[in-house]
């Protein structure tokens, strides 16, 4: 409650009518204005010493709570007043997969960064300074202190900014490409993840755990859509695997083509495959944090989407991914 909105109770005993004239005559003697506690209370008057003490205690308690909130929120203000001269600052949340998605890319590129995990319970995402860099008041957001404190928001935009800048400064970027065709393919999968994969899992989680009342049809609808999305990824990875096996397992290629020997017999059946090219890119890594929570909506990747499961397992073993998911 704002102190300016808080009503201070007055003495309303049975003798209040009889005391009105006395109170008016002695107004200057027994009325005290509390002007040093809050600008919003300058016009509040207390007319009874006992009431004075009670109300002052209430005011002090409220002011203490407001002061505590201001101190908690002030770390955001303090940061923006004293930003680092170099490196990157990532604004995230402990339960936000999209924030960890950006952390994975920063870690993979070995870029110096610090993470500020916002406290949503205290409304830090609505701090004016933060809204200035992310008008959507959500995470993630990134500040590039190397580049005049440039701010970027939305996970996909942040990722493309990072790999494009890295390529420009270093001449190559293994998570991206200098080839326009590959760039378009990587971008397609990245946008598919940000627009179709993550939001559907997010909605399934919401209606399963956080909605105010059960809506089974919503849970079913979003969970089914997540399965459809994984079906798209599963098929793409399976095609990559088949192409890989046919290319590397030459002596058995004819048997695989004829169907007399299943692909699962190949020694390359568990070899890592990727969505674009022969290496992990941001197209692949952007899926990791959300794949890591999809079991919470009742989807078993190992059973239902074995290629997605193997693909995720390979990425989860990467040192940079491990560091990022730990919050290092």
Curated annotation (Swiss-Prot):
Q: Where is the stretch described as Disordered?
A: 1-35
The species this protein belongs to is Candida maltosa
InterPro entries membership: Glutathione-S-Trfase_C-like, Glutathione-S-Trfase_C_sf, Glutathione_S-Trfase, Glutathione_S-Trfase_N, GST_C, Thioredoxin-like_sf, Ure2
Coiled coil spans = none
Has UniProt tagged this entry with the keyword Nucleus?
no
Q: Which Gene3D superfamilies match?
A: 1.20.1050.10, Glutaredoxin (3.40.30.10)
Q: Which UniProt keywords apply?
A: Nitrate assimilation
**Signal peptide location in the record?**
none
Which family, according to the similarity comment? Belongs to the GST superfamily.
What is the protein named? Protein URE2
Query: An example of a Gene Ontology BP annotation on this entry?
Result: regulation of nitrogen utilization
What PANTHER family would the database entry show? GLUTATHIONE S-TRANSFERASE-RELATED, TRANSCRIPTIONAL REGULATOR URE2
Q: Where is the composition biased (Polar residues)?
A: 1-14
Segments forming domain GST C-terminal:
179-328
- Sequence ranges of Low complexity compositional bias: 15-30
Q: How does it assemble?
A: Homodimer.
| Function statement | Plays an important role in the cellular response to the nitrogen source. URE2 gene plays a major part in the repression of GLN1 and GDH2 genes by glutamine, and is required for the inactivation of glutamine synthetase. URE2 gene product may catalytically inactivate GLN3 in response to an increase in the intracellular concentration of glutamine.
Question: Which residue range or ranges hold the GST N-terminal domain?
Answer: 86-170
């Amino acid at each position: 409650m704002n102190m300016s909105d808080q009503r201070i109770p007055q003495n309303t005993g049975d003798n209040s009518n009889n005391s009105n004239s006395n109170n008016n005559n002695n107004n200057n003697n027994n009325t005290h204005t509390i002007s040093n506690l809050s600008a919003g209370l300058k016009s509040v008057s207390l007319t009874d010493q006992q009431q004075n003490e009670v109300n002052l205690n209430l005011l002090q308690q409220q002011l203490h709570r407001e002061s505590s909130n201001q101190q908690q929120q002030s770390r955001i203000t303090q940061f923006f007043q004293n930003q680092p001269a170099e490196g990157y600052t990532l604004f995230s949340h402990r339960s936000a997969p999209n924030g960890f998605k950006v952390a994975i890319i920063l870690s993979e590129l070995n870029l110096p960064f610090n993470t500020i995990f916002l406290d949503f319970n205290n409304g830090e995402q609505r701090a004016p300074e933060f809204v200035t860099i992310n008008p959507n008041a959500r995470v993630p957001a990134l500040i590039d202190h190397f580049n005049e404190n440039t701010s970027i928001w939305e996970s996909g935009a942040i990722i493309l900014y990072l790999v494009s800048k890295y390529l420009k400064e270093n001449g190559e970027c293994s998570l991206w490409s200098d080839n326009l065709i590959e760039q378009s393919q990587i971008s397609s999968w990245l946008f598919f993840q940000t627009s179709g994969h993550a939001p559907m899992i997010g909605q399934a989680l919401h209606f399963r755990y956080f909605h105010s009342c059960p809506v089974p049809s919503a849970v079913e609808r979003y969970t089914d859509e997540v399965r459809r999305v994984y079906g798209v990824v599963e098929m793409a990875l399976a095609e990559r695997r088949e192409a890989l096996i046919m290319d590397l397992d030459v002596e058995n290629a004819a048997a695989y083509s004829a169907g007399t020997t299943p692909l699962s017999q190949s020694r390359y059946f568990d070899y890592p495959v990727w969505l674009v090219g022969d290496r992990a890119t941001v197209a692949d890594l952007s899926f990791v944090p959300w794949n890591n929570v999809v079991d919470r909506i009742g989807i078993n990747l190992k059973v239902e989407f074995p290629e997605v499961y193997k693909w995720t397992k390979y990425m989860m073993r990467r040192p940079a991914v491990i560091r990022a998911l730990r919050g290092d």
